[in-house]
């Protein structure tokens, strides 16, 4: 895959630590956001669900008319109140027409919902791919909690993939990552 027209390589996300022995932890903001946007509405690519706790995400979703109004003023420079109000009404109707309002929207955001995107190949491994935004469950384990916001576990990314291995990446810089990975 490519990001901003540049081919994605192992080093795009995986950076050696200062010793060159291990890799730095991958973080969403630094390594994932460019490919895995939190945009939930393809009609408004600049409007994203916050990468925050479930209560904040639920509050964002339940305040969508306000979020759309702020987005229209900030990003689309809609300054007339009537124009802004019409924009918000259109966006809310677009969501409703796709069954993405209220509980259905929350379910689609918190739980991956099975939306599958284009097939991609990473490090030679094929797969069905995922939509650019496929819900919190794309990376996190999400547990329903009845009427309360769901429990969202931190993404499970190990600090060391092979805890007992004694391998020094710095000694293998002449090799392509794909030769082993």
Regions found by a protein language model. Give the residues of each.
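Conserved mid-sequence domains
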Residues: 168-181
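Primarily the internal scaffold of c-type cytochrome electron-transfer domains
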Residues: 1-8, 17-138, 142-166, 170-171
